[in-house]
Amino acid sequence: MIMRPDFAEGVRAAVRAWGLGNCARRSSLYSDTVTAVVVEPGFDANRIIQAAYHNYGVSLGAGLGKVAGKVFRIGHLGWLNEPMVLQALGGVELAMRDCGVNFTAGSGVGAAIEHYTDRREPLALAAE
């Protein structure tokens, strides 16, 4: 398993930009493999999960146990790159828009882009 803490922080930046919460209440509890996004009270997070999958082909995890229906999970581990994470975040934004979640469209993707470009080292090209 490849854990990507930098990708995780980009996802957390998106969650903050959406005005939603992280299920982990302290940063010391944040995971480098998955972020559980807390939706507004009374809203069923499973609606977002279903819309993301059926409308955009994006697979999100469901909340389990006490957080069932209260969170959706975004994974950020394995063979990923920044565009793949941004694509997933875009799919989440589309699904949230479909479900009537109140947020500024593009805010999460934009926050992740800012995070990734602020910390990225340029790739060395073979021709250089």
What are these regions (language model features)?
Residues 20, 57-58, 101:
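Short aromatic/hydrophobic-glycine micro-motifs
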Residues 21-55:
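Conserved PLP-binding catalytic core of the aspartate aminotransferase-like
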Residues 66, 70-128:
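PLP-dependent enzyme catalytic core of the Aspartate aminotransferase-like
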